[in-house]
Amino acid sequence: MNSGGAGFSRRAFLGAGAAIGGLALLAPTRAGVARAAAPFEPTREVTLTAGEMELKLLGPDKPATRILAYDCTPFQTLRMPRGTRLKATFVNGIDEGSTLHFHGIRMPNEYDGVPTLTQPLVQPGSRFVHLLPLDDPGTFFFHPHCDETGQAGMGLAGVLIVEDTRDPAFDAEHVLCLKDWRLAPDGSFLPLTEPEGASKAGTFGATRTVNGAAALELKAPAGGHARLRILNIDSTRIMDIGVEGGDAWLIAVDGHALPPVRLDDLPDGIWRMGPAQRIDLDIRMPADGSPVTLGDYRAADIYHFATLTAEGRVSKPRKGPLALPKADLPQPDMKRAARLSFTLQQATGQAVKEIALPADDPLATALIDSLCVGATTYWGIQSESWPTGANRSVPPPLARMTTGTSYVVEIKNETRFPHPVHLHGHAFEVRASSLDRLPRHFADTVLVQPGEAVEIAFVAAPGDWVFHCHILEHMETGMMGWFRIV
């Protein structure tokens, strides 16, 4: 990879395909992690091969960029029915180690794609098989979970849509992947991380795209309802998604249905979404055929990324909104829930401590591959930081939990910057915000503003699950930990 940057100095000495002292051996077996009792019978099989391809991100008449993609398809979209038993084989066709993580999918822990913690790093030319029960309908995505700033920053991501036959029939549907790119005028990549960005809000790209284009013109019938699945797959940027020209309702967050919320009734008439977050919108097209525009309103220079224009007309307009079936998820027992609290911090000598796993822990002697750690620590959770630099030992879990127990977790942000916090392997209920800005909903990632405390609740599923900021530079420079659930 040629993504460069101060945060990942290992690129200076890692050659293509090189392994460091056998550190990418099989991840240790972990006691207490449940595996499926019944044989897994796949009903669908796919192979996803990571590789390079060219894409003209700067414009049709400008130089092309060598990006990363699965199966030479930018932001490849897979569609499968709810209930699918998916056998997904990841083939690493790039020149450094990688893994595949299916973001937001509730799955057996061994298929989560986190190197060292749940599986070995997949070396160039090697493969790894994931067995995934797709029981939750919605909009999900997949991406690497090592050197994410480099690999995802260069485009390595895809979309997984789990379809539900119970959904209402929309008159149109579109999938929109929002991503920025850090490009030089010749189409090459600028450094994807810089210390000034990694230690603050992140290193931003200036070339903004939706599905790899500057903007899109989409079609929907006049008077009809269009379902828009919007994914923020950027490494850094937080976006304020708004709609002009038509009625719009928020009908799902991170794939999970919620009672429709009119976008105009939310604070500032927008939905704020950080990296890795997804929303589904129901947009009712004007009966007179006038267009509807979608934009990111976070900056003064609004980025209008899509326009819905009328094509045809529905014969029997529906008032709407078109609600999705209620999410069928484990419901936390609030009367018996255990309570925990975690604080997001900027790392200083006083704020972050180094502690080790007990000597008898199966992961005590495991080392994280140098590819998967940053060079510098800037961030921490609860006075602990994920390893960086020469420290590559797996840290102790932030918490030990019990399978099947309900937990209420408070996430407090003591930093000056917002953080989209993601918990693997679970769908949690976002129950409360100290800023009183969020409707109650289920999600796998929640954006926590500076000075805010957000309360989430979930039923613990067995495994070793990471808990991290999804601004990728923040994660790779310390803001990641893990929960052990047995």
Q: Where does each model-flagged region fall?
A:
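Active/binding-pocket-proximal capping segment
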Residues: G245-L258, E414-A443, P462, L472-E476, ...
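Short tyrosine-centred short linear motifs in exposed loops/low-complexity segments
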Residues: G83-T84, S126, L134-F140, G223-G224, ...
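Aromatic/His-enriched, Gly/Pro-containing loop or helix-boundary segments
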Residues: Y70-D71, F75-T77, N109-T139, C146-T149, ...
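N-terminal secretory signal peptides
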Residues: M1-F8, A12, A19
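N-terminal edge beta-strand
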Residues: K62-R79, A206-E217, A375-T403
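Extended terminal and domain-junction accessory segments
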Residues: A16, G22-L25, G32-T49, A152-A184, ...
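Histidine- and aromatic-rich segments of cupredoxin/plastocyanin-like copper-binding domains
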Residues: Y111-D112, T116, P120-Q123, P191-M334, ...
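Asparagine-centered strand-capping/turn motif at beta-strand->loop junctions
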Residues: F90-I94, L231-I233, I411-T415
